């Protein structure tokens, strides 16, 4: 379960909505990668500098921050080439007529994975989804695994996903998109599979059916498709 007190009863949500004003969805506090990076570095370096005062402090991240930053330096060096490749692959995908499902990944250390899902790691979730897709999805369907924008590259998803897909006989139908525009993908996708990522909200806005693999604050009847994943591949319901 999540720790949210937000109701999950559709009737109760509608009753609350009937008393609320029309929301202003215009961004008030726009963010940026530079701002988020500055906040992250400041937080972690302060923790490192004051470690002698708090020797029992435990990090919430699975990796040491300096190792994480080293991986980010490598990622940033190849960002332009990676973005061009992702957009090219996305354009090719959108030109095809076969239906496809999008699986947006979450970062490996995401507490929503570690504390609010049946998976110990994101890699376990990936293996679960590919196995289900290989066994039960329609033969013409494709699965697009979309990396998280803040993935540090410590795991090579293109290699890992490719190997799992080939081992399960769906190597030609499963692809990894390391970049691209999630909104454009969701607008064309037959469905979105997620553990409990906020990417589910983007899917709602695009009118794309969402299937959850774990608990989430938006796991509400009539909002997400609660069918088993094996059924969702065939009849995704918005």
PLM segments and residue spans:
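Catalytic-core helical/loop segments in enzymes performing group transfer/polymerization on anionic/lipid-linked
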Residues: 1-238
């Amino acid at each position: 379960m999540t720790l949210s007190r937000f109701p999950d009863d559709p009737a109760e949500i509608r009753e609350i909505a009937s008393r609320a004003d029309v929301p202003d969805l215009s961004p008030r506090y726009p963010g940026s990668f530079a701002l988020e990076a500055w906040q992250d570095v400041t937080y972690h370096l302060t923790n490192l500098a004051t470690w002698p005062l708090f020797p029992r402090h435990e990090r919430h991240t699975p990796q040491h921050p300096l190792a994480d930053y080293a991986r980010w330096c490598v990622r940033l060096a190849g960002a332009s080439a990676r973005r061009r490749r992702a957009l090219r692959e996305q354009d090719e995908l959108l030109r095809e007529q076969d239906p496809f499902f999008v699986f947006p990944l979450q970062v490996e250390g995401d507490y929503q994975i570690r504390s609010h899902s049946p998976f110990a790691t994101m890699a376990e979730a990936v293996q679960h989804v590919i196995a289900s897709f290989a066994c039960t999805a329609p033969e013409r369907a494709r699965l697009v695994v979309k990396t998280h924008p803040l993935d540090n590259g410590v795991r090579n998803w293109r290699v890992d996903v490719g190997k799992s897909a080939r081992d399960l006989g769906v190597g030609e139908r499963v692809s990894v998109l390391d970049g691209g525009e999630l909104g454009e993908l969701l607008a064309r996708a037959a469905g979105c599979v997620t553990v409990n990522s906020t990417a589910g909200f983007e899917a709602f806005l695009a009118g794309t059916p969402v299937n959850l693999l774990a608990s989430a604050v938006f796991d509400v009847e009539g909002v997400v498709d609660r069918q088993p994943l094996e059924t969702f591949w065939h009849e995704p319901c918005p």
